[in-house]
Amino acid sequence: MRIKLLKKVTARLLILLSVFFISCNTRQKVKLGSGSAVRLSKDKELKLIGNRFFTLSTVVRVNQIETSRNKSDGTDESSVHSLEEARTFREANEKGWPGARITWALSWLALKDHRPNYMDLKKLVVSYHEKYGDEITFIPGGYFANMYNSRAQVNLDLHEGLQMVSEMVGRGYRPQSVIAGFLSPENLRYLAEEEGIHICQGNIWSQYAVDNGDGEGSISYPYYPSREHFCKPAQCKADLIDCINLDGWIVDFLTARFSGIGNGDIYSRQGVGPIETVLFPGTELGTKEMIATTAAHFDTGFALNKFAWVSWIWELCLVEGRKIYGYNGRNGMDGVAIWLSEMRRRWPEAKCITQGEFGMLWRSQFKNNDRLNYCFVMSGSGIRGSEPEMGIRWFMNKDFRLALLSNRKGQSSEKVIDFTRYDLKAKEPADPSGGQPIRNWSLMNRLNQKGTRAQDKPINIDELNENEKAIIKSRYPQFVKKF
C-alpha cells in the first residue's frame, strides 16, 4: 500500500514539476522579444502580393571596409560607434515609422571588439531585438568578401560570424538573413544547405566603378540565384540555389545607367542611398529624389508587379560620419525623418519589416524563377543625372533583362540600352590569390546600360537579330509587332 501511495505521490510531483518547468520556459519565451510579439502577431497573415514593403538595415563595423578578418581598407570609424549614435538612429526610425522592425548587421571586427563602446552598443542592439523584434545578423568582408577572400574562407567566416551573433543574442537565436553586399553562389549555397539561412542581400544592383567591387548585371528584385553566377537567376531546378538574392539599395533607374561616382554632379548610386542622395546634394534635393525613387516602386511598380519593395541600408557610422568625413557638416538624419514621414503619409499601409521576414514572404510566394516578370517605369526626377526629359522602362525575368530609354525632347523612339541574357552561360572569376583582389564580378553580355564597352551603344529595338527578337517576343509580344 505504501509503495502504491509513494508511486502516486511521485507521479503527481513529476507532473507538477513538468508544469512548473513548462511555465518557466513559456515565460522566458514571452520575455524574449515580448515587445515584438505583439507586433509580429499583427503581421501573422501578411502576404507578399498586394503589399508594399520597406526593408531598413544598418551596419555596425569598426573600419570603413573590412576586407577580411584582420585587414581593412579605409578609415577607422570606431569613434562614431557608440550608444548615442545607435539610439539616435533607432529612435529616429521608430518616430518616423512606429512599429518598424529593422535589420542590424555586425562585422567580424565589431563582433570581436571588447572596448566599452562596442560592448555597450551590442547590448543595446540585443535590447532592440527584444523590444522591437529587430533582426541581428552578420556581414562578411565589408560588402566585398569574395573580392578579397577565397570562397572557402568566406564560408568559414559566415559560419563563425553567425555563431558569434547567436552567442551575442543568446537563447538559441538565429537570424533569417545575412547582409553581404556581393556574395558568390558557392557561399549562397553554403548559407542555404549548411547554415539553414535562405535569404541574403547578395547583390548591389547596377554597382559599377564604385567602392571596392563591381557586380553589375542582375535583376533588381528578389530571385533564386544560379550556381554559375550570383547575378544570374537560376534557370532550372538543378541550377537553383535556395537562398533568395536581394538588392541592398534601390537606386534611380535613370542615374543607374551611368558608371561610377562624381561624374560632374552625376552619381550612379543616387536613389535612396544616404551618401549620394542626401549627404552630397543636401536635404532639400535629397529628399525630393528619395521620394521620387520610392514612388517608382510604391506607385507605378506596385501597379505593374502587384507588390512593391524599397530596400535601404544606412551604415551606423553615417549618423555622425561628418565628424570623420566632413559631408559639408551634414548627417542626413533630417532627410531621413522627412522621407519616412512622407512615406507614411502617402503609403500608410506599407510595411516596414526585417530583411529576413521580407525574403521569407517572397520565398513562400515563389518556388522558382519561372513566374518572375518584374516591370518598372520611371521618369526623370530632375535631380542631377535623373534628367526630367528622360524616361526608362525595365523588364526583368528569368531569361533576360531589357531596358528601353526614351527622350521626350526630339527622340522618335525608345532605345535599347540594356539586353542582358540569362539563358547564356555565365562564369564568375576564380578566387583571389597572392594578395591581389579581383574587383569586377559583373555579368555583361549582349548590351549593358553602363556603356563601358565599345558594343554598349543604344540601339533601336529592330536592330536586334532574329534570335534576340524571338527571345523578347516569348515574354513581351507587344514589342515585336514592328519587326
Predicted regions and their residues:
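Well-ordered, non-membrane alpha-helical segments in soluble/globular domains
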Residues: 73-91, 116-125, 152-162, 283-300, ...
